[in-house]
Curated annotation (Swiss-Prot):
Keywords: Coiled coil, Membrane, Transmembrane, Transmembrane helix. It comes from the Eukaryota. This is Single-pass membrane and coiled-coil domain-containing protein 3. Residues 62-92, 183-207 form a coiled coil. InterPro entries: DUF4533, SMCO3. It comes from Homo sapiens (Human). The gene is SMCO3.
Length: 225
């Protein structure tokens, strides 16, 4: 038992809690990497993008991994903005506004995009039109993606940001030492509160992101039948 445990008998429990919360954070990070790569694959296949996949940096910090996802999403958003600008340029203003209208049927939106997608991409597929509608013509999906970026940036800037991803494999004491070293011996309780606070938002944002991109993929599969 560490000497501090005699003075703070709750420390062993807190160490276990930090360990558990750290794993939950890593699970959310891993999911966000996977979903971002799935989205990248869809964009490369159907919109002709050349986006690279990303991989969790196991020897990096939480901030470094958050930044990897943020950078990948920003590149995705840049490609989607190009498609949006092309649609705005090629479509009649009334038709373009319909793409942004949540009351319009998705099938009608796909039909609108289908009119000009060949001019934009060089070929016309209903799958490409569906991707454009789900990702460019949906303020809901855009909002979900932006929220994830915001949450990741907040985690990276928090006291958790400098914690190494791999410390979990080195044992609970190593996690504790890493945390204490990173924040100049801030109490375990503060670390737990930080994990809990950010996990609530991260889990919510990650789940919504996963759901939104899964919906895009399912729509594309339906269009390809």
């Amino acid at each position: 038992m560490a000497q501090s445990d005699f003075l703070y008998p709750e420390n062993p429990k807190r160490r276990e809690e930090v360990n558990r919360l750290h794993q939950q954070l890593l699970d959310c990070l891993s999911d966000s990497f996977d979903v971002t790569n799935k989205l990248t694959e869809v964009l490369n296949m159907h919109l002709g993008c050349r986006l690279a996949s990303i991989e969790m940096k196991r020897d990096g910090t939480i901030k470094e991994n958050c930044d990897l996802i943020i950078q990948a999403i920003m590149k995705i958003q840049k490609e989607l903005q190009k498609v949006d600008e092309a649609l705005k340029d090629k479509l009649e203003p009334t038709l373009y506004r319909k793409l942004q209208d949540i009351k319009e049927k998705e099938t009608d939106k796909i039909a609108i995009v289908q009119k000009v997608i060949s001019v934009i991409l060089g070929e016309a597929t209903s799958a490409a039109s569906a991707v454009a509608v789900k990702l460019v013509g949906s303020n809901v999906t855009t909002g979900i993606i932006n929220k994830l970026v915001t949450v990741l940036a907040q985690i990276g800037a928090s006291l958790l940001g400098s914690i190494g991803v791999a410390v979990l494999g080195l044992g609970i004491d190593m996690i504790v030492r890493a945390i204490l070293g990173a924040v100049e011996k801030t109490q375990l309780q503060a670390a737990i509160k930080s994990y809990e606070k950010h996990l609530v938002e991260f889990k919510s944002a990650s789940e919504k992101y996963n759901h939104a991109i899964t919906e895009v993929i399912n729509t594309v599969k339906h269009q390809m039948k």
